[in-house]
């Protein structure tokens, strides 16, 4: 069955067409709204299965009590309680005691059969009756004056254009935790008291990670206290995209609608936590129609910084459009003066040496160590170094162990678990992760109720990183075979498993070729898919990448350019400069808007050292948080890679 036929089949069933997008941006299946048709049907099916199991259990109890009733009735009426006498110490008690006991068992069986039948016919009727009795209270006297219900001013913000109070704009900061600075210290999870990383690694060498293997696995299991928060600000268009799955079925208040994540796979435990404040808040977009008589105009420049310009008006009062700022216009005038022959213009010709000296002085203003303080850490930040060479070597091995224990090994285990479920389905044509295409698996996850409640919908973002499913699954299992991914090859990969045409039972392997991803690119894409699952969607990511909150904000690939948000001061991201040969960098923007690239060794250690630099910067310069998700033990648990 081809991909086109699968798409037509899905389209004919009025399903969400975005689930068949096989590009790397298609990770929506792991972030479905709990009110979407897919998740609603999943919950309905779960409730039906629970109800069916409850009825089956009650019917089994009724059958056993009927058998008990029949046996003791025959013993009491026909055998004169001889069977009861044999059970009770072989006739030790008198006959009237045996007769009373058999009669008691008969009455007990009748009562239990009646109660079970009533429970099947009217489930939870007695509990509801008792609950209503407890909750019933005498009516309160009506007050003489009715007071209108005023919503809490702390939860409702007036973001309209007519509002004069704009303090909420200054109070809100995108990408920072929504709590006080006194709470920035990372606290361990209330469910698990884990020792600090320094205590665990004090007596452990680089080659021995037995003390951290169990702790690093907590990244999939420990619920993040501030992770996957459901509170953010979105534009109206983005909110429509997020809630498009249930707009036609349930009336939704667009200003206070809920959107809860259901990322509960791999034992994250997030489904049990209910956020008290999980509302979306719609923000007003900036327009230039507010005051036409204003002499100033606010504009976001190419470097991402906000610029305020004075408007120039002509003789008739119309505004003269000038997209260039004063500095760009000055550079154009100077360049024109350089190209103009001497003696034909009144503009002085500026020498190249003066121009270059000015450029060098501007560069020294943000990167020269002479302006920094005497501390070694600040000097390293301004020269583009976050970790020393010894720290990078240790962090490289720790990052290898963290990725293997936290992402690759659980991923391989749950792929085998889903394959066992698919084998029991006996589908025609047969489905299997690693053999079937991603489109076929997505269609099966939508059509079959048994797969909706499985781990398959949450595996789809990881399976979408490359179309060759056989090589992808085989390479994941090969990489997670050892603690430090000894099979990792930065500029190549493993052999490709293929079926031999002559002998169908024989599995042969072809050497790695350019059509397959390198291990560096493969591990990087899987790392991005995992991080996308940990963060919430954000209003800065745009309308088409709401399902990639981490990739769209903290990653730049070779064919892309940094977005305006990534070029703003104090932002940071991972940059995959080239794919062949693969080379990654960590880049952070200083207070002047200049990009500082950290020195990362090339070849095999490159990817892991770049990720370690990223984690180090988040921990020390961003309070240990990515957006509202902690990277410490209470969240994603990434800080273990730092010694």
UniProtKB/Swiss-Prot annotation:
Protein's UniProt name: Uncharacterized protein B0464.6
Top-rank taxon, per record: Eukaryota
GO cellular component: membrane
Region (Disordered) residue spans: 179-200, 349-377
Biased composition (Low complexity): 179-199
């Amino acid at each position: 069955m081809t991909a086109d036929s699968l798409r037509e089949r899905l389209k004919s069933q009025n399903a969400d067409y975005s689930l068949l997008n096989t590009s790397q941006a298609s990770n929506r299946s792991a972030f479905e709204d709990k009110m979407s048709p897919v998740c609603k049907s999943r919950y309905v099916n779960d409730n039906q299965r629970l109800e069916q199991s409850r009825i089956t259990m009650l019917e089994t109890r009724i059958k056993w009590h009927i058998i008990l009733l029949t046996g003791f009735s025959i013993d009491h009426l026909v055998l004169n309680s001889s069977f009861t006498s044999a059970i009770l110490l072989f006739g030790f008690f008198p006959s009237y005691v045996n007769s009373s006991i058999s009669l008691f068992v008969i009455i007990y069986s009748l009562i239990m059969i009646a109660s079970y039948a009533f429970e099947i016919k009217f489930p939870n009727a007695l509990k509801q009756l008792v609950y209503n009795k407890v909750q019933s209270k005498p009516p309160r006297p009506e007050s003489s004056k009715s007071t209108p219900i005023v919503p809490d001013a702390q939860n409702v913000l007036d973001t309209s254009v007519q509002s004069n109070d704009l303090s909420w704009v200054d109070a809100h900061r995108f990408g920072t935790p929504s709590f006080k600075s006194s709470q920035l210290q990372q606290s361990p999870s209330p469910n698990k008291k884990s020792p600090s990383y320094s205590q665990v690694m004090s007596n452990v060498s680089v080659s021995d990670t037995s003390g951290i293997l169990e702790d690093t696995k907590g990244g999939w299991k420990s619920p993040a206290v501030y992770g996957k928060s459901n509170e953010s600000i979105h534009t109206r268009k983005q909110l429509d995209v997020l809630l498009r799955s249930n707009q036609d079925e349930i009336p939704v208040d667009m200003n206070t609608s809920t959107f809860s994540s259901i990322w509960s796979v791999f034992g994250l435990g997030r489904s049990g936590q209910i956020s008290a404040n999980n509302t979306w808040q719609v923000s007003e977009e900036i327009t230039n129609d507010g005051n036409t008589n204003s002499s100033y105009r606010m504009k976001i420049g190419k470097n991402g910084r906000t610029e305020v310009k004075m408007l120039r008006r002509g003789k008739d009062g119309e505004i003269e459009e000038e997209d260039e700022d004063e500095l760009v216009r000055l550079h154009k005038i100077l360049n024109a003066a350089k190209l103009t022959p001497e003696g034909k213009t009144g503009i002085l010709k500026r020498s190249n040496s003066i121009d270059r000296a000015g450029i060098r002085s501007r560069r020294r203003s943000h990167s020269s160590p002479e302006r920094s303080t005497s501390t070694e850490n600040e000097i390293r930040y301004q020269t583009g170094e976050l970790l020393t060479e010894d720290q990078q070597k240790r962090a490289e091995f720790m990052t290898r162990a963290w990725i293997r224990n936290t992402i690759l090994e659980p991923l391989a285990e749950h792929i085998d678990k889903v394959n066992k479920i698919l084998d029991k389905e006996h589908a025609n044509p047969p489905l299997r992760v690693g053999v079937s295409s991603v489109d076929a698996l997505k269609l099966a996850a939508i059509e079959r109720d048994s797969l909706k409640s499985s781990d398959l919908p949450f595996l789809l973002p990881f399976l979408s990183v490359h179309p060759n499913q056989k090589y992808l699954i085989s390479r994941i299992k090969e990489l997670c075979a050892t603690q430090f991914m000894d099979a990792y090859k930065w500029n190549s990969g493993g052999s490709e498993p293929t079926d031999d045409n002559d002998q169908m039972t024989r599995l042969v392997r072809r050497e790695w070729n350019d059509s397959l991803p390198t291990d560096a690119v493969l591990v990087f894409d899987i790392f991005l898919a995992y991080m996308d699952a940990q963060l919430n969607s954000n209003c800065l990511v745009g309308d088409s990448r709401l399902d990639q909150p981490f990739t769209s904000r903290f990653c730049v690939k070779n064919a892309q350019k940094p977005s305006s948000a990534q070029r703003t001061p104090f932002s940071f991201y991972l940059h995959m400069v080239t794919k062949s040969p693969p080379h990654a960098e960590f880049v952070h923007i200083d207070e002047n808007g200049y990009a500082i690239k950290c020195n990362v060794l090339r070849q095999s250690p490159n990817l892991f050292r770049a990720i370690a630099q990223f984690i180090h910067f988040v921990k020390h310069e961003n309070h240990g948080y990515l957006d509202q998700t902690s990277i410490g033990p209470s969240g994603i648990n990434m800080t273990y890679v730092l010694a």
